[in-house]
């Protein structure tokens, strides 16, 4: 993927960058694999805002992506590489030998005409899906399942990949793009390779309207609101301090650096290295005999 730059002939193009879409081979999606996409605009069934800064945006049709890769031992051919408005990664259309068609996330360097397959005996090649237990150490993978046969849930964004670090017992240790290290069941499937469109993070929107096309509404600072709208609001003329010892959320809870993960979450024992605070858990100390200077 290449990035196209614009000259500053208008304020909106001064810092604007877009993709050249050079890897896209067709602009018509497979009709049998698209559905209507209903936008909730950040509201629940009562119309109450449950997620701020969402709403509007261009109409989109949802592409049905095969995250499970459960058509084992059936060879498929990459028919086209397409744009998906619902994600920053590209998608690849597969034609199976039995006539079925499915979309998958497009891995980097996978081209039209390539052959992919999923299953325990699949070769270690880009685009193939295998159980973690059969993937060699150090291999880059994406679209990883957290529970067997439930479909890939992590490492699906453009340009991301995880790395197989170790294998022990019924678990495989994986290093995620955030540098978090966690254990995953060895029966879980993952796809070989790195997700394509690696320059997606380098795109600059350039103007507010482009954010609105994506369905992103403005983010307003609490300090410029009224007291009825935010704990930071109010204060008279000009700029005023928030009047608190630390910043808080619109609902009065501490913000900036407060942990939000449930301390009793079932998967906590499987997370070996937490990056947010960069500390090693007791499980990692026992497993790798790591000494920490306190």
Swiss-Prot record:
It comes from the Eukaryota. PROSITE patterns: RIBOSOMAL_L2. It is found in: Plastid, Chloroplast. Residues 224-249 are annotated as: Disordered. GO terms for biological process: mitochondrial translation. GO terms for molecular function: rRNA binding; structural constituent of ribosome; transferase activity. InterPro entries: NA-bd_OB-fold, Rib_uL2_dom2, Ribosomal_uL2, Ribosomal_uL2_bac/org-type, Ribosomal_uL2_C, Ribosomal_uL2_CS, Ribosomal_uL2_dom3, Ribosomal_uL2_RNA-bd_dom. GO terms for cellular component: chloroplast; mitochondrial large ribosomal subunit. Keywords: Chloroplast, Plastid, Ribonucleoprotein, Ribosomal protein. NCBIfam families: rplB_bact. Belongs to the universal ribosomal protein uL2 family. HAMAP family: Ribosomal_uL2_B. Part of the 50S ribosomal subunit. This is Large ribosomal subunit protein uL2c. It comes from Porphyra purpurea (Red seaweed).
């Amino acid at each position: 993927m290449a990035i196209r730059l614009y000259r500053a002939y208008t304020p909106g193009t001064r810092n604007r960058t877009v993709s050249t879409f050079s890897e896209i081979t067709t602009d018509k999606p497979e009709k049998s694999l698209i559905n209507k996409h209903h936008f909730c605009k950040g509201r629940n069934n009562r119309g109450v805002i449950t997620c701020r800064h969402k709403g509007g945006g261009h109409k989109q049709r949802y592409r049905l992506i095969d995250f499970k890769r459960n058509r084992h031992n059936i060879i498929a051919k990459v028919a086209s590489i397409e744009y998906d408005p619902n994600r920053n990664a590209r998608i690849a259309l597969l034609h199976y030998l039995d006539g079925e068609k499915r979309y998958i996330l497009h891995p980097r360097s996978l081209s039209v005409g390539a052959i992919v397959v999923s299953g325990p005996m699949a070769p270690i090649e880009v685009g193939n899906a295998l159980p973690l237990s059969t993937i060699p150490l150090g291999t880059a993978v994406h679209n990883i399942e957290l529970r067997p046969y439930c479909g890939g849930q992590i490492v699906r964004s453009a340009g991301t990949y995880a790395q197989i670090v170790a294998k022990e017992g019924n678990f495989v240790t994986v290093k995620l793009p955030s540098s978090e290290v966690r254990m995953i069941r060895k029966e879980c499937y993952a796809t070989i390779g790195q997700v394509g469109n690696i320059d997606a993070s380098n795109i600059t929107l350039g103007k507010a309207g482009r954010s609105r096309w994506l369905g992103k509404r403005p983010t307003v600072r609490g300090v410029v609101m009224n007291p009825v709208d935010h704990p930071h609001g109010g204060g008279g003329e000009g700029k005023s301090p928030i009047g608190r010892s630390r910043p808080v959320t619109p609902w009065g809870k501490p913000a900036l650096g407060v942990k939000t993960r449930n301390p009793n979450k079932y998967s906590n024992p499987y997370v070996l290295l937490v990056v947010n605070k960069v500390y090693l858990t007791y499980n990692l100390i026992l497993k790798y005999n790591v000494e920490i200077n306190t």
